[in-house]
Design a protein with these regions (language model features):
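DUTPase catalytic domain/fold
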Residues: 1-141
Length: 141
């Protein structure tokens, strides 16, 4: 998959424990960013990618940032479509009580690349199912 550094100091995504053990590659911040409590902030990575047709990338929070500092992604998972050529930026949200600073080079999210199926809708009546219209709470506790 093609990748381009928009800034020389950008860090290429990599698997922390190797591709045989990790599904997600770490994305790093390319500059410092202070995350104020409750205020979403886009953090740049300095990277752009060319995702092949039939694939997508999903950007997800890092569990360590969430556990230790209450930093998450309000739009998780973020989707990167194959046609997008802009900079990869990560929307972070500080759910903690104090400001938290992400430093250049810090791992801020995980990116997973996967195939997807494009579908075409066929309008018409739906077949019956055992579940029917049972939605939220329909399976019990």
């Amino acid at each position: 998959m093609r990748i381009q550094k928009l800034r020389q100091d950008a860090v290429l995504p990599k698997y922390a424990h190797g591709s045989h053990e990790d599904a997600g590659m770490d994305l790093c911040a390319v500059e410092d960013a202070t995350l104020e409590p409750g205020v979403p902030r886009l953090v740049p990575t300095g990277l752009t990618v060319e995702i092949p047709p039939g694939y997508e990338a999903q950007v997800r929070p890092r569990s360590g940032l969430a556990l230790k500092h209450a930093i998450t992604m309000p739009n998780a998972p973020g989707t990167i479509d194959p046609g997008y050529r802009g900079e990869l930026r990560v929307l972070l949200l500080n759910l903690g009580r104090e400001a938290y600073t992400v430093h250049a080079g810090d791992r801020i999210a995980q990116m997973i690349v996967a195939r997807y199926e494009a579908v075409e809708w066929v309008e018409g009546e739906l077949a019956d199912s055992a579940r029917g219209t049972g939605g939220f709470g329909s399976s019990g506790r």
